[in-house]
Amino acid sequence: MALFHVRMDVAIPRDLDPKVRDETIAKEKAYSQELQRSGKWPEIWRIVGQYSNISIFDVESADELHEILWNLPLFPYMNIEIMPLTKHGSDVK
């Protein structure tokens, strides 16, 4: 498995049809919760005061992460930063 730290900043256009906005957000929530339940998205944290999150993904590869992110319904409205992670030599676990 490969771990990734992912920051997602969302910027939905103000002129987006409200119905489309609501449907997209509902689809995003369902998709992300499915990934959380599967263990592929074990951590998600809101950044206070922003429409942003910091997430940890536990996936097979960078290719799998790419597919997951591209399938996010809000992907077209996101700026995403990805950092691959590895175990730290001083970790006591």
Curated annotation (Swiss-Prot):
Top-level class of the enzyme under EC nomenclature: isomerase
Pathway terms, separated by semicolons: Aromatic compound metabolism; beta-ketoadipate pathway; 5-oxo-4,5-dihydro-2-furylacetate from catechol: step 3/3
Q: Which family does it belong to?
A: Belongs to the muconolactone Delta-isomerase family.
Q: Which terms are listed as keywords in the entry?
A: Aromatic hydrocarbons catabolism, Isomerase
Q: Name one GO biological process term.
A: beta-ketoadipate pathway
- Source domain of life is Bacteria
Catalytic activity from the UniProt record:
(S)-muconolactone = (4,5-dihydro-5-oxofuran-2-yl)-acetate
| Official protein name in the record | Muconolactone Delta-isomerase
Q: Which InterPro entries match?
A: Dimeric_a/b-barrel, MLI_dom, Muconolactone_d_Isoase
Report if keyword Cytoplasm is assigned.
no
**What gene name is listed for this protein?**
catC
Q: What is its EC number?
A: 5.3.3.4
The source organism is: Rhodococcus opacus
A Pfam family: MIase
Q: What is the lineage of its organism?
A: Bacteria, Bacillati, Actinomycetota, Actinomycetes, Mycobacteriales
- Is rRNA-binding one of the keywords? no
Q: Gene3D superfamilies annotated for this entry?
A: Dimeric alpha+beta barrel
